[in-house]
């Protein structure tokens, strides 16, 4: 998804800007992802489940300079979300969605107290936007206000667990989807190289996963298309979670394609955030009751 690709690029940009501000990285780097070979991001994992493990500038990994400084770690959003102690222990900067895995009990407790689940909030907000858009000449302004509210409340319950900090103004900027989409199109159409973190077929980039699995890794994009760059090995602490989550994704696909309750049960019962087979079974029954076309989820022989 383009929004998430943009966020990986933004994470690297924030880290590099932080190091430049502290005099720990060159100040004359120009555009971060212009494909000139000066900057290489070491990132590997799956969509919503990856770790930034290195940030090479002119052949030198500058990420250890960040990891030595708790004050620098907690100067940007992901660092505040996870805390300097955990980031230093991991030796990598996690994707923000890993908060649900590292702090699952805490996040669940806060989510249960929330006025509404995130999905319900977004559905209501979007419906309100469409209704109001029919009665205003400033649709662009209305959308910007809607988008800003969405960004301001993004991962609000997770931030509550981590100290209730507010998002920085720079993290609220728009342009995620379009910037990445245009960067890819520009690189291909004009044969102007760019380095981006993209979701592509694995093809041995991560040897623990099947070749056909979709992974999130650094790529070079140019007039000849998309090319995987050398991908850092998954950290030891990450390998099990990634392999397990990919198994869940594959069984979910099996369930949908083959209309199989068995595959769906395997998927849900092996998901790290589902703590009981009984819970998985109840979820499947609830899905079957709530959505048309999922009746097969109640067929124990499917």
Language-model segment annotations:
Residues 8-36, 54:
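Rossmann-like NAD(P)H-binding beta-loop-alpha module
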Residues 7-8, 46:
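An acidic- and aromatic-residue-enriched active-site/binding cleft used to recognize and process polar
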């Amino acid at each position: 998804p383009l929004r998430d690709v943009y966020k990986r690029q933004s994470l690297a940009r924030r880290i590099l800007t932080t190091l430049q501000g502290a005099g720990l990285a060159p100040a004359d780097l120009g555009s971060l992802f212009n494909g000139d070979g000066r900057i290489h991001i070491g990132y590997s994992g799956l969509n919503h489940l990856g770790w930034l493990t290195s940030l090479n500038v002119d052949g030198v990994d500058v990420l250890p300079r960040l990891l030595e400084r708790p004050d620098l770690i907690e100067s940007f959003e992901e660092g505040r979300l996870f805390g300097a102690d955990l980031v230093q222990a991991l030796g990598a900067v996690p994707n923000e969605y890993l908060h649900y895995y590292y702090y699952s009990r805490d996040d669940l407790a806060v989510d249960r107290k929330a006025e509404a689940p995130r999905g319900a909030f977004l559905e209501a907000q979007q419906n309100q936007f469409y209704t109001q858009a029919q009665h205003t000449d400033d649709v662009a302004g209305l959308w910007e206000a809607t988008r800003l509210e969405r960004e301001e409340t993004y991962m609000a319950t997770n931030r509550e667990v981590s100290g209730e900090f507010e998002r920085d103004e720079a993290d609220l900027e728009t342009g995620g989807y379009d910037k990445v989409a245009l960067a890819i199109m520009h690189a291909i159409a004009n044969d102007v190289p760019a380095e981006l973190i993209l979701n592509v077929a694995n093809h041995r980039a991560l040897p623990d996963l099947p070749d056909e699995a979709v992974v999130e890794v650094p790529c070079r994009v140019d007039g000849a298309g998309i090319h995987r760059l050398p991908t850092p090995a998954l950290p030891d602490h990450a390998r099990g979670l990634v392999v397990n989550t990919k198994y869940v994704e594959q069984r979910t696909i099996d369930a949908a394609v083959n209309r199989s309750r068995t595959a769906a049960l395997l998927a849900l019962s092996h998901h790290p955030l589902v703590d009981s087979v009984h819970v998985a079974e109840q979820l499947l029954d609830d899905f079957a009751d709530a959505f048309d076309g999922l009746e097969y989820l109640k067929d124990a022989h499917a």
